[in-house]
Protein backbone atom coordinates (compact mmCIF):
# COMPACT_ATOMS: atom_id res chain seq x y z
CA UNK A 1 0.00 0.00 0.00
CA UNK A 2 1.37 3.41 -0.98
CA UNK A 3 2.11 5.64 2.00
CA UNK A 4 0.50 9.11 2.00
CA UNK A 5 2.84 11.99 1.33
CA UNK A 6 3.09 15.56 2.60
CA UNK A 7 1.56 16.72 -0.71
CA UNK A 8 -1.36 14.32 -0.24
CA UNK A 9 -2.17 16.06 3.02
CA UNK A 10 -2.18 19.53 1.55
CA UNK A 11 -4.56 18.31 -1.14
CA UNK A 12 -6.86 16.34 1.15
CA UNK A 13 -7.06 19.19 3.66
CA UNK A 14 -8.61 21.59 1.18
CA UNK A 15 -11.82 21.41 3.21
CA UNK A 16 -12.66 20.19 6.70
CA UNK A 17 -15.15 20.55 9.53
CA UNK A 18 -15.31 20.10 13.26
CA UNK A 19 -17.20 16.84 12.80
CA UNK A 20 -14.86 15.36 10.20
CA UNK A 21 -11.33 16.75 10.60
CA UNK A 22 -9.16 16.79 7.53
CA UNK A 23 -6.14 14.56 8.04
CA UNK A 24 -2.73 16.10 7.50
CA UNK A 25 -0.21 13.86 5.76
CA UNK A 26 3.45 13.65 6.67
CA UNK A 27 6.72 12.43 5.23
CA UNK A 28 6.59 8.66 5.62
CA UNK A 29 9.91 7.49 4.25
CA UNK A 30 10.54 4.65 6.66
CA UNK A 31 10.25 1.27 5.05
CA UNK A 32 11.01 2.51 1.56
CA UNK A 33 14.02 1.27 -0.38
CA UNK A 34 17.30 2.16 1.26
CA UNK A 35 19.53 4.70 -0.50
CA UNK A 36 22.53 3.49 -2.44
CA UNK A 37 25.80 3.38 -0.46
CA UNK A 38 26.97 6.58 -2.13
CA UNK A 39 23.86 8.36 -0.85
CA UNK A 40 24.48 7.49 2.78
CA UNK A 41 24.91 10.45 5.11
CA UNK A 42 27.36 9.96 7.95
CA UNK A 43 26.75 12.23 10.91
CA UNK A 44 28.23 13.03 14.30
CA UNK A 45 26.63 14.41 17.44
CA UNK A 46 28.28 17.22 19.40
CA UNK A 47 26.55 17.63 22.74
CA UNK A 48 24.78 14.43 23.79
CA UNK A 49 22.32 15.88 26.31
CA UNK A 50 18.58 15.39 26.13
CA UNK A 51 17.94 17.49 23.04
CA UNK A 52 21.00 16.38 21.11
CA UNK A 53 20.19 12.74 21.78
CA UNK A 54 16.57 13.24 20.74
CA UNK A 55 17.72 14.92 17.54
CA UNK A 56 20.04 12.03 16.78
CA UNK A 57 17.31 9.45 17.27
CA UNK A 58 15.14 11.33 14.77
CA UNK A 59 18.00 11.71 12.31
CA UNK A 60 18.75 7.99 12.40
CA UNK A 61 15.15 7.21 11.42
CA UNK A 62 15.81 8.84 8.04
CA UNK A 63 16.91 6.11 5.61
CA UNK A 64 20.61 6.15 4.81
CA UNK A 65 21.78 8.12 7.87
CA UNK A 66 24.59 6.62 9.96
CA UNK A 67 26.12 7.84 13.22
CA UNK A 68 29.92 7.79 13.28
CA UNK A 69 30.95 9.82 16.34
CA UNK A 70 29.71 11.53 19.50
CA UNK A 71 31.41 14.31 21.46
CA UNK A 72 30.42 15.39 24.96
CA UNK A 73 32.24 16.76 27.98
CA UNK A 74 30.62 14.29 30.45
CA UNK A 75 31.95 10.73 30.36
CA UNK A 76 28.58 9.28 31.37
CA UNK A 77 26.97 10.54 28.19
CA UNK A 78 29.76 9.08 26.09
CA UNK A 79 29.22 5.71 27.74
CA UNK A 80 25.49 5.99 27.15
CA UNK A 81 26.07 6.80 23.47
CA UNK A 82 27.81 3.46 23.01
CA UNK A 83 25.03 1.68 24.90
CA UNK A 84 22.38 3.19 22.63
CA UNK A 85 24.11 3.35 19.26
CA UNK A 86 26.77 0.66 19.47
CA UNK A 87 30.39 0.21 20.43
CA UNK A 88 31.49 1.13 16.90
CA UNK A 89 30.54 4.78 17.55
CA UNK A 90 33.68 6.84 18.25
CA UNK A 91 33.40 8.99 21.38
CA UNK A 92 35.49 11.92 22.53
CA UNK A 93 35.40 14.89 24.87
CA UNK A 94 36.89 17.15 22.19
CA UNK A 95 34.48 18.17 19.42
CA UNK A 96 37.44 19.22 17.27
CA UNK A 97 38.34 15.55 16.84
CA UNK A 98 34.90 15.04 15.31
CA UNK A 99 35.34 17.96 12.92
CA UNK A 100 38.68 16.53 11.79
CA UNK A 101 37.13 13.21 10.72
CA UNK A 102 36.89 12.69 6.96
CA UNK A 103 34.06 10.16 7.36
CA UNK A 104 31.67 12.72 8.90
CA UNK A 105 29.62 14.79 6.46
CA UNK A 106 27.29 16.57 8.86
CA UNK A 107 27.08 17.35 12.56
CA UNK A 108 24.25 17.87 15.00
CA UNK A 109 25.09 20.55 17.56
CA UNK A 110 23.16 20.00 20.80
CA UNK A 111 25.48 21.83 23.18
CA UNK A 112 24.56 24.61 25.61
CA UNK A 113 23.68 27.81 23.77
CA UNK A 114 26.97 29.60 24.39
CA UNK A 115 28.76 27.07 22.17
CA UNK A 116 26.36 27.12 19.19
CA UNK A 117 27.90 29.87 17.08
CA UNK A 118 31.51 28.84 17.63
CA UNK A 119 31.07 25.15 16.86
CA UNK A 120 28.76 25.83 13.90
CA UNK A 121 31.29 28.21 12.38
CA UNK A 122 34.20 25.82 12.92
CA UNK A 123 32.19 22.91 11.54
CA UNK A 124 31.36 24.73 8.32
CA UNK A 125 34.99 25.79 7.94
CA UNK A 126 35.87 22.10 8.25
CA UNK A 127 33.52 21.28 5.38
CA UNK A 128 30.66 19.88 7.46
CA UNK A 129 26.97 20.58 7.02
CA UNK A 130 25.33 21.65 10.27
CA UNK A 131 22.11 21.02 12.15
CA UNK A 132 22.34 23.40 15.11
CA UNK A 133 19.84 23.54 17.91
CA UNK A 134 17.93 26.72 18.58
CA UNK A 135 18.70 29.46 19.26
CA UNK A 136 21.33 29.59 16.53
CA UNK A 137 23.35 32.09 18.55
CA UNK A 138 23.51 33.13 22.19
CA UNK A 139 24.34 36.77 21.49
CA UNK A 140 23.18 39.18 18.79
CA UNK A 141 26.74 40.01 17.75
CA UNK A 142 27.35 36.35 16.80
CA UNK A 143 24.62 36.21 14.18
CA UNK A 144 26.24 37.87 11.19
CA UNK A 145 29.34 35.72 11.60
CA UNK A 146 27.36 32.48 11.31
CA UNK A 147 25.44 33.80 8.29
CA UNK A 148 28.71 34.78 6.61
CA UNK A 149 30.36 31.43 7.38
CA UNK A 150 27.50 29.48 5.80
CA UNK A 151 27.80 31.57 2.64
CA UNK A 152 31.60 31.52 2.52
CA UNK A 153 31.90 27.75 2.91
CA UNK A 154 28.73 26.92 0.89
CA UNK A 155 27.46 24.66 3.64
CA UNK A 156 23.95 23.59 4.52
CA UNK A 157 22.99 24.97 7.93
CA UNK A 158 19.58 24.23 9.40
CA UNK A 159 18.40 25.42 12.80
CA UNK A 160 16.44 23.02 14.99
CA UNK A 161 13.04 24.69 15.26
CA UNK A 162 11.06 21.88 13.72
CA UNK A 163 7.83 23.84 13.30
CA UNK A 164 9.26 25.15 10.04
CA UNK A 165 9.00 21.61 8.60
CA UNK A 166 5.66 20.80 10.26
CA UNK A 167 2.69 19.89 8.09
CA UNK A 168 0.49 21.65 10.66
CA UNK A 169 2.33 24.94 10.17
CA UNK A 170 2.39 24.38 6.42
CA UNK A 171 -1.41 24.19 6.49
CA UNK A 172 -1.62 27.32 8.64
CA UNK A 173 0.63 29.09 6.13
CA UNK A 174 -1.60 27.99 3.25
CA UNK A 175 -4.75 29.17 5.03
CA UNK A 176 -3.22 32.52 5.90
CA UNK A 177 -2.03 33.11 2.35
CA UNK A 178 -5.50 32.24 1.03
CA UNK A 179 -6.99 35.11 3.04
CA UNK A 180 -8.97 32.79 5.31
CA UNK A 181 -8.76 35.10 8.35
CA UNK A 182 -9.01 38.41 6.53
CA UNK A 183 -6.46 41.01 7.54
CA UNK A 184 -4.18 39.90 10.37
CA UNK A 185 -3.97 42.31 13.31
CA UNK A 186 -2.60 40.28 16.24
CA UNK A 187 -0.74 37.09 17.10
CA UNK A 188 -0.66 35.58 20.58
CA UNK A 189 1.05 32.49 21.92
CA UNK A 190 1.64 31.00 25.34
CA UNK A 191 3.28 28.03 27.04
CA UNK A 192 2.39 27.06 30.60
CA UNK A 193 4.29 24.54 32.68
CA UNK A 194 4.04 23.36 36.26
CA UNK A 195 6.74 20.76 36.85
CA UNK A 196 10.37 20.63 37.93
CA UNK A 197 11.55 19.19 34.61
CA UNK A 198 9.51 21.79 32.74
CA UNK A 199 11.39 24.43 34.72
CA UNK A 200 14.76 22.89 33.73
CA UNK A 201 15.38 21.13 37.07
CA UNK A 202 17.16 18.29 35.31
CA UNK A 203 18.71 15.34 37.16
CA UNK A 204 22.36 15.76 38.17
CA UNK A 205 24.26 12.44 37.94
CA UNK A 206 25.89 11.50 41.25
CA UNK A 207 29.19 10.65 39.55
CA UNK A 208 29.64 14.15 38.11
CA UNK A 209 33.09 15.36 39.19
CA UNK A 210 36.17 17.10 37.80
CA UNK A 211 37.35 13.62 36.83
CA UNK A 212 34.26 12.71 34.77
CA UNK A 213 33.57 16.19 33.36
CA UNK A 214 35.77 18.42 31.20
CA UNK A 215 34.75 21.52 33.13
CA UNK A 216 37.03 23.98 31.36
CA UNK A 217 35.74 22.88 27.96
CA UNK A 218 32.15 23.33 29.16
CA UNK A 219 32.89 26.89 30.32
CA UNK A 220 34.54 27.84 27.04
CA UNK A 221 34.47 31.62 26.75
CA UNK A 222 32.11 31.97 29.75
CA UNK A 223 33.53 33.39 33.00
CA UNK A 224 35.85 30.99 34.81
CA UNK A 225 34.60 29.47 38.06
CA UNK A 226 35.15 26.35 40.20
CA UNK A 227 33.44 23.10 39.25
CA UNK A 228 29.71 23.27 39.91
CA UNK A 229 27.67 20.43 38.39
CA UNK A 230 24.38 22.30 38.72
CA UNK A 231 25.60 24.85 36.20
CA UNK A 232 26.42 22.11 33.72
CA UNK A 233 23.35 19.90 33.97
CA UNK A 234 20.92 22.81 34.50
CA UNK A 235 22.69 25.29 32.26
CA UNK A 236 19.47 26.81 30.92
CA UNK A 237 19.05 28.52 34.30
CA UNK A 238 22.13 30.71 33.82
CA UNK A 239 22.78 33.60 31.49
CA UNK A 240 26.44 32.63 31.10
CA UNK A 241 25.47 29.52 29.12
CA UNK A 242 21.81 29.76 28.13
CA UNK A 243 19.25 32.24 26.88
CA UNK A 244 16.41 31.73 29.35
CA UNK A 245 12.78 31.38 28.40
CA UNK A 246 13.09 33.44 25.20
CA UNK A 247 15.97 31.38 23.78
CA UNK A 248 14.47 28.04 24.76
CA UNK A 249 10.79 28.63 23.99
CA UNK A 250 10.03 32.00 22.41
CA UNK A 251 12.43 31.20 19.57
CA UNK A 252 10.21 28.28 18.52
CA UNK A 253 7.27 30.66 18.38
CA UNK A 254 9.20 33.22 16.33
CA UNK A 255 10.25 30.49 13.91
CA UNK A 256 6.68 29.30 13.48
CA UNK A 257 5.32 32.83 13.08
CA UNK A 258 7.97 33.82 10.56
CA UNK A 259 7.32 30.68 8.51
CA UNK A 260 3.53 31.03 8.46
CA UNK A 261 3.59 34.74 7.64
CA UNK A 262 6.82 35.06 5.63
CA UNK A 263 7.83 37.57 8.31
CA UNK A 264 11.39 38.62 9.07
CA UNK A 265 10.98 40.15 12.50
CA UNK A 266 9.62 42.94 14.67
CA UNK A 267 10.79 46.53 14.84
CA UNK A 268 10.05 46.97 18.55
CA UNK A 269 10.56 44.56 21.45
CA UNK A 270 9.33 44.95 25.04
CA UNK A 271 9.46 42.47 27.91
CA UNK A 272 8.53 42.04 31.53
CA UNK A 273 8.38 39.17 34.00
CA UNK A 274 10.23 37.94 37.05
CA UNK A 275 11.47 35.06 39.17
CA UNK A 276 8.24 34.09 40.93
CA UNK A 277 8.65 30.50 42.08
CA UNK A 278 11.85 28.64 41.15
CA UNK A 279 14.22 30.34 43.58
CA UNK A 280 16.96 27.77 43.05
CA UNK A 281 19.89 30.05 42.27
CA UNK A 282 18.95 30.68 38.65
CA UNK A 283 19.49 34.18 37.27
CA UNK A 284 16.72 34.19 34.64
CA UNK A 285 12.95 34.67 35.05
CA UNK A 286 10.47 31.81 35.33
CA UNK A 287 7.58 34.02 34.20
CA UNK A 288 7.99 36.14 31.09
CA UNK A 289 5.85 38.23 28.77
CA UNK A 290 7.08 39.69 25.49
CA UNK A 291 5.35 42.28 23.29
CA UNK A 292 6.36 42.93 19.69
CA UNK A 293 5.38 45.28 16.88
CA UNK A 294 5.73 43.93 13.35
CA UNK A 295 5.64 46.43 10.49
CA UNK A 296 3.64 46.07 7.30
CA UNK A 297 5.46 44.16 4.55
CA UNK A 298 4.55 42.69 1.18
CA UNK A 299 3.71 39.43 2.99
CA UNK A 300 1.61 40.64 5.91
CA UNK A 301 -0.03 43.74 7.41
CA UNK A 302 1.28 45.45 10.51
CA UNK A 303 0.39 43.48 13.63
CA UNK A 304 1.10 43.24 17.34
CA UNK A 305 2.23 40.04 19.03
CA UNK A 306 2.28 38.82 22.62
CA UNK A 307 4.23 35.80 23.87
CA UNK A 308 4.12 34.51 27.42
CA UNK A 309 5.52 31.62 29.43
CA UNK A 310 4.78 30.66 33.03
CA UNK A 311 6.78 27.89 34.72
CA UNK A 312 4.49 27.84 37.78
CA UNK A 313 1.00 27.73 36.32
CA UNK A 314 -1.33 25.95 38.72
CA UNK A 315 -3.69 24.96 35.92
CA UNK A 316 -1.06 22.58 34.55
CA UNK A 317 0.69 22.16 31.23
CA UNK A 318 -0.82 23.93 28.25
CA UNK A 319 0.09 25.92 25.19
CA UNK A 320 -1.67 27.84 22.46
CA UNK A 321 -0.96 29.80 19.31
CA UNK A 322 -3.47 32.14 17.62
CA UNK A 323 -3.27 34.21 14.43
CA UNK A 324 -6.09 36.73 14.73
CA UNK A 325 -7.61 38.46 11.72
CA UNK A 326 -10.64 40.66 11.21
CA UNK A 327 -12.56 37.77 9.59
CA UNK A 328 -11.26 34.70 11.39
CA UNK A 329 -8.68 33.09 13.66
CA UNK A 330 -6.13 30.34 13.05
CA UNK A 331 -5.38 28.34 16.20
CA UNK A 332 -2.47 25.90 16.28
CA UNK A 333 -2.51 23.31 19.01
CA UNK A 334 -4.53 20.37 20.24
CA UNK A 335 -5.59 18.41 17.16
CA UNK A 336 -3.59 20.48 14.68
CA UNK A 337 -4.73 23.75 13.14
CA UNK A 338 -8.25 25.12 13.46
CA UNK A 339 -9.81 27.86 11.35
CA UNK A 340 -12.60 29.65 13.21
CA UNK A 341 -14.77 32.26 11.53
CA UNK A 342 -17.52 34.09 13.39
CA UNK A 343 -18.79 36.72 10.95
CA UNK A 344 -19.09 40.26 12.18
CA UNK A 345 -22.75 41.45 12.07
CA UNK A 346 -23.45 43.50 8.96
CA UNK A 347 -25.66 45.81 10.99
CA UNK A 348 -23.79 48.30 13.21
CA UNK A 349 -26.33 48.10 16.04
CA UNK A 350 -27.53 51.01 18.12
CA UNK A 351 -27.31 52.42 21.66
CA UNK A 352 -30.20 54.81 22.17
CA UNK A 353 -31.60 54.16 25.66
CA UNK A 354 -30.45 57.53 27.00
CA UNK A 355 -32.07 59.52 24.17
CA UNK A 356 -35.58 61.04 24.41
CA UNK A 357 -38.31 58.56 23.46
CA UNK A 358 -39.36 60.41 20.30
CA UNK A 359 -35.74 60.47 19.10
CA UNK A 360 -35.39 56.76 19.87
CA UNK A 361 -38.42 55.97 17.72
CA UNK A 362 -37.07 58.11 14.87
CA UNK A 363 -33.68 56.38 14.98
CA UNK A 364 -35.31 52.92 15.10
CA UNK A 365 -37.50 53.62 12.07
CA UNK A 366 -34.52 54.85 10.05
CA UNK A 367 -32.39 51.90 11.22
CA UNK A 368 -35.02 49.29 10.28
CA UNK A 369 -35.44 50.87 6.87
CA UNK A 370 -31.70 50.82 6.24
CA UNK A 371 -31.11 47.40 7.81
CA UNK A 372 -34.24 45.24 7.33
CA UNK A 373 -34.39 41.95 9.29
CA UNK A 374 -32.51 39.08 7.65
CA UNK A 375 -33.85 35.54 7.64
CA UNK A 376 -30.62 33.92 6.41
CA UNK A 377 -28.44 31.72 8.61
CA UNK A 378 -24.67 32.28 8.66
CA UNK A 379 -22.20 29.47 9.24
CA UNK A 380 -19.98 29.62 12.32
CA UNK A 381 -18.48 26.11 12.15
CA UNK A 382 -14.77 25.49 12.66
CA UNK A 383 -12.50 23.76 10.17
CA UNK A 384 -10.01 21.41 11.84
CA UNK A 385 -6.93 19.95 10.12
CA UNK A 386 -5.20 17.19 12.06
CA UNK A 387 -1.92 15.32 11.56
CA UNK A 388 -1.94 11.52 11.56
CA UNK A 389 -1.51 9.70 14.84
CA UNK A 390 2.13 9.60 15.90
CA UNK A 391 3.18 12.38 13.53
CA UNK A 392 6.62 13.87 14.30
CA UNK A 393 7.59 17.26 12.96
CA UNK A 394 11.07 16.64 14.35
CA UNK A 395 11.39 13.69 11.97
CA UNK A 396 10.13 15.79 9.07
CA UNK A 397 12.70 18.43 9.97
CA UNK A 398 15.49 15.87 9.65
CA UNK A 399 14.08 14.61 6.36
CA UNK A 400 14.37 18.21 5.14
CA UNK A 401 17.95 18.47 6.41
CA UNK A 402 19.13 15.15 5.01
CA UNK A 403 17.53 15.83 1.64
CA UNK A 404 19.35 19.18 1.53
CA UNK A 405 22.67 17.56 2.41
CA UNK A 406 22.19 15.08 -0.43
CA UNK A 407 20.89 17.48 -3.07
CA UNK A 408 22.65 20.72 -1.97
CA UNK A 409 19.33 22.54 -2.18
CA UNK A 410 18.65 25.38 0.29
CA UNK A 411 16.56 24.90 3.42
CA UNK A 412 14.01 27.38 4.74
CA UNK A 413 15.46 27.57 8.25
CA UNK A 414 18.94 28.54 7.15
CA UNK A 415 21.38 30.83 8.95
CA UNK A 416 19.56 34.02 7.99
CA UNK A 417 16.17 32.61 9.02
CA UNK A 418 17.74 31.27 12.22
CA UNK A 419 19.26 34.64 13.09
CA UNK A 420 16.00 36.45 12.42
CA UNK A 421 14.20 34.05 14.77
CA UNK A 422 16.89 34.14 17.46
CA UNK A 423 17.36 37.91 17.45
CA UNK A 424 13.94 38.98 18.79
CA UNK A 425 14.19 36.24 21.43
CA UNK A 426 17.58 37.52 22.57
CA UNK A 427 16.31 41.10 22.45
CA UNK A 428 13.49 40.03 24.76
CA UNK A 429 16.14 39.21 27.35
CA UNK A 430 17.86 42.54 26.70
CA UNK A 431 14.58 44.41 27.13
CA UNK A 432 13.85 42.59 30.39
CA UNK A 433 17.26 43.17 31.96
CA UNK A 434 17.65 46.72 30.62
CA UNK A 435 14.04 47.58 31.55
CA UNK A 436 13.57 49.32 28.21
CA UNK A 437 11.88 48.92 24.85
CA UNK A 438 14.30 47.99 22.07
CA UNK A 439 14.25 48.99 18.41
CA UNK A 440 15.36 46.41 15.84
CA UNK A 441 16.04 46.54 12.12
CA UNK A 442 14.78 43.15 10.89
CA UNK A 443 15.99 43.69 7.33
CA UNK A 444 19.57 44.60 8.25
CA UNK A 445 19.41 42.42 11.40
CA UNK A 446 20.84 45.13 13.65
CA UNK A 447 19.79 46.78 16.89
CA UNK A 448 19.05 50.48 16.54
CA UNK A 449 20.26 52.48 19.51
CA UNK A 450 18.73 55.90 20.07
Task: Show which residues each predicted segment covers.
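N-terminal secretory signal peptides and thylakoid transit peptides that target proteins
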Residues: 1-17
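N-terminal Rossmann-like dinucleotide-binding module
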Residues: 16-85, 163-166, 257
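Short, solvent-exposed loop/turn and secondary-structure capping segments
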Residues: 54-58, 80-83, 118-122, 142-143, ...
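Glycine-centered tight turns that cap/initiate beta-strands
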Residues: 64, 103, 180-183, 265
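Conserved SAM-binding strand-loop segment of SAM-dependent methyltransferases
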Residues: 89-94
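N-terminal Rossmann-like NAD(P) cofactor-binding module of classical short-chain dehydrogenase/reductase
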Residues: 107-108
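Beta-strand-loop-alpha-helix segment that lines the small-molecule cofactor/substrate pocket
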Residues: 112-113, 117-165, 179, 435
Amino acid sequence: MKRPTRRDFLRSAAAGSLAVPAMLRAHELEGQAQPAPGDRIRIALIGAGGQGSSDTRSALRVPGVELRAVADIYDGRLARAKEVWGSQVVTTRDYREVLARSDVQAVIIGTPDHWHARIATEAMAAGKDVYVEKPMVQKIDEGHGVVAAAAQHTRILQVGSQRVSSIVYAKARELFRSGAIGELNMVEAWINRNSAIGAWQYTIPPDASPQTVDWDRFLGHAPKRPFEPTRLFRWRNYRDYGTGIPGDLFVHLFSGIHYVLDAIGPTRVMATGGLRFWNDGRDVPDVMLGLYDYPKTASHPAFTMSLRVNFADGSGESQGFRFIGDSGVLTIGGPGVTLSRKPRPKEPGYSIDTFPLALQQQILEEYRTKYPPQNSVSSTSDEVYSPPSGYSDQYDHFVTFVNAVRSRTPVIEDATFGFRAAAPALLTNDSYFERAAITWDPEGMRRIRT
